[in-house]
Amino acid sequence: MTGYTLTCPVCNKEFSDSYTLTCPGGCQGLIRAKYAARQITLHDAPGVFKYMDWLPVTGVLRTRAEPVCFKSEGLARALGLSDLWIVFSGYWPEVGAFAVSGSFKEFEAFPTMQRLSERTKGIIQVSSAGNTGRAFAEVSAETCQPVIIVVPESARDRLFTTSPAHDTLLITISGDYTDAINLGSRICTLPGIFPEGGAKNVARRDGMGTVMLAGTLAMGTLPDWYLQAVGSGTGGIAAYEASLRLIADGRFGTRMPRLLLFQNEPFIPMVRAWQEKRREIKDEDMPDAEQAISQVYSDVLTNRTPPYGIVGGVFDTLIATNGLMAGVSSADAQEAGKLFSSSEGIDPDPAAAVCVAGLMRAVRSGVIKPDEKILLNITGGGYARGRKDLPRFVKAPDIMVSKETPFEKISAKVQEWMRYYA
């Protein structure tokens, strides 16, 4: 098992990991993992941990969840593409996809929980619009590791697992994803609770980066294009960082893939900022944010505070990859989802349908050429099949609050629950 250190992209200092989320020197940038293994070797390890050369862990958890890549036939034929590859993250046994939560967020959750257990003692807190929370609840249910999850009240039904999540404390808040993030941040001020960290967590980014690893290893070379629908944009950052490692590996080509990232109209703050080549997201990039969020097809793509302008964030990633961003309408996403289901034989997550719609537009407009090598990240799917095959336990909220609930009341309930894990 190879080791790693952490590095800061601002001051370039190297330091050891103690579940570190930021530069010890106070720099404002996304720290990265620097792995001892320059070339990746696949390990005989469960699921996503086969890529542990480039994951910030030394041990593994039992899982079958990993990204599965294959060359498209049905969708490629429908769009007139000769070299379209799909990385599928979700539940689809026929192709070997066993992310039972239905989302690529499992690829983040497993290494994040393992990293926490190896590097510190405490309980992890996750704020989510649904998919991330469900993935962490699934890992908790499988490993008995405690986790505190905060989601908007509208997402409570998305918190289901394949075995009872006895060690998950689920808090719902009336509001949206940003309200869940804000409450989660306050909960993390309590002793013994650690934020999962979002884009700042190298385990989350490098877990997501396994999508690019799986795709490149299946294709034998880096793609010309990498496509994904994004809310925070962390998946795009992860794809770029994985590509840097694959180029340094020396066996998969030297040309950086171009990133094409999509947001769901009408909530497209990063698209607006990027079109003007601004590092900062302004209030006018998300006018009437709550109304816009209520109109999207995929509300997991609605982060109001994405890691866009931070050093090493989405803006820098798009600059480094000569990348593009575009908005996709909900109507186009729904039609694209139907096309994907009929042509490939599995239902995509709404966010993945947004990505398919973006691909269709890019092909029609000539941005993507028919013979280019395309890696399409289907970030979730197989829910219909999962409902048939898998046990389902919907996690009932343990604490239900509004934005007006005094934090002292919430804090007391959280600390009472934590006593079971002291």
Swiss-Prot record:
Its cofactor is pyridoxal 5'-phosphate. Disulfide bonds: none annotated. GO terms for biological process: coenzyme M biosynthetic process. The keyword Transferase applies. Pathway: Cofactor biosynthesis; coenzyme M biosynthesis. It catalyses: O-phospho-L-serine + sulfite + H(+) = L-cysteate + phosphate. One of its GO terms (molecular function) is pyridoxal phosphate binding. The modification N6-(pyridoxal phosphate)lysine is found at residue 105. It is an enzyme of class 2 (transferase). Specifically catalyzes the beta-elimination of phosphate from L-phosphoserine and the beta-addition of sulfite to the dehydroalanine intermediate to produce L-cysteate. This is Cysteate synthase. It comes from Methanospirillum hungatei JF-1 (strain ATCC 27890 / DSM 864 / NBRC 100397 / JF-1).
